[in-house]
Design a protein with these regions (language model features):
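A short beta-strand-to-alpha-helix junction
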Residues: 17, 81-94, 137-145, 156-172, ...
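Short glycine/proline-rich turn/loop motifs
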Residues: 6-9, 72-83, 150-156
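Beta-strand elements within well-structured catalytic alpha/beta cores of enzymes
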Residues: 39-47, 91-94, 98-101, 114-123, ...
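Histidine-centered active-site microenvironments of extracellular/periplasmic hydrolases
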Residues: 58, 106-154
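Membrane-interface soluble catalytic domains
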Residues: 106-109, 153-258
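A long, amphipathic alpha-helix that forms part
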Residues: 20-35, 67-114
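Active-site-proximal alpha/beta segments of enzymes that process anionic O-linked groups
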Residues: 2-70, 191
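Short catalytic/ligand-binding loop motif for oxyanion handling, primarily in non-cytosolic enzymes
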Residues: 2, 48-56, 61, 124-128, ...
Length: 258
């Protein structure tokens, strides 16, 4: 096997260098992966969206901009624009690197029979809720839980869906529409088909320690370490008079624990 598949760390002094490295390595690997008839699975994780730093020569698309994420400057009153523009500049570089991969796939005619997914594992907050939250992993509001999800399927026409979906929906979609599984998604997943417009009420979001249920209009029912449930609206404002229908809550708890 290639040393690329054996290494535990990607070489490079900066986040950008390492993202460029995995792109270069993958473009070279495609010459082998795409040369035969065997199916292959590939995963590229671009870290610029997490590292949020670039050299000065890359900070030209969005201004004014910081050169790095200076978290010590952040508070509830600071103008987020320079920090947000730094993030935009980083994402523009990720977009460019992903474009190189797509171009290579096109050149090798692999887009004719390859599913391509571009997504993220979480959102990124820049104090949009005006409660001094920055980054991710600190609340379950839309700005931290909404993510892009682009699915390219060469066998289907382009379409934009505007109903609520979750990452849980991808596996049932893949199993049903690509792999030919006929069992209902409820047998193995909390998700639905991505094209299914049914309600996603009571879908689960979580981090390493806690979790929450998201219901109507992104109402957040967050389990606290004490076992209590804290209820807030999409802007993290407490909802004191919200009534929980335990007939709906209990089955969701049971499914989450399975």
């Amino acid at each position: 096997a290639s040393d690329v598949y054996k290494r535990q760390h990607t070489p490079g002094e900066t986040v950008y260098d390492r993202d460029c490295c995995i792109t270069t390595d993958y473009l070279q690997a495609l010459d082998t992966l795409g040369s035969g008839t065997q199916p292959f699975f590939s995963f590229l994780f671009y870290d610029l969206a997490h590292g949020i730093e670039l050299s000065k020569d890359k900070l030209y698309r969005f201004k004014p901009t910081w050169e790095f994420a200076d978290y010590m400057k952040l508070d509830n009153n600071i103008d987020p624009t320079p920090f947000l523009n730094l993030y935009y500049n980083c994402m523009a570089e990720v977009d460019s690197l992903a474009g190189c991969v797509l171009q290579k796939l096109a050149e090798k005619k692999l887009l004719d029979n390859t599913l391509v997914i571009i997504t993220g594992d979480h959102g990124q907050e820049f104090n949009e809720n005006h409660k001094n939250y920055w980054g991710h992993g600190s609340n379950y509001s839309p700005v931290q839980t909404h993510i892009p999800f682009l699915l390219y399927d060469p066998g289907k026409p382009s379409h934009t869906y505007r109903h609520v979906t979750t990452h849980y929906d991808f596996v049932p979609t893949l199993m049903t529409e690509v792999l030919g599984v006929t069992s209902p998604p409820s047998d193995y997943s909390m998700g639905h088909l991505l094209t299914d417009t049914c309600s996603r009420n009571w879908h689960v979001v979580g981090d390493y320690l806690d979790y929450a249920f998201i219901v109507d209009n992104h109402t957040i029912l967050e389990k606290q370490p004490s076992g209590c449930i804290e209820i807030s609206d999409s802007l993290l404002n407490p909802l004191e008079d919200y009534k929980i229908d335990t007939r709906k809550l209990n089955p969701e708890f049971k499914q989450t624990m399975q």
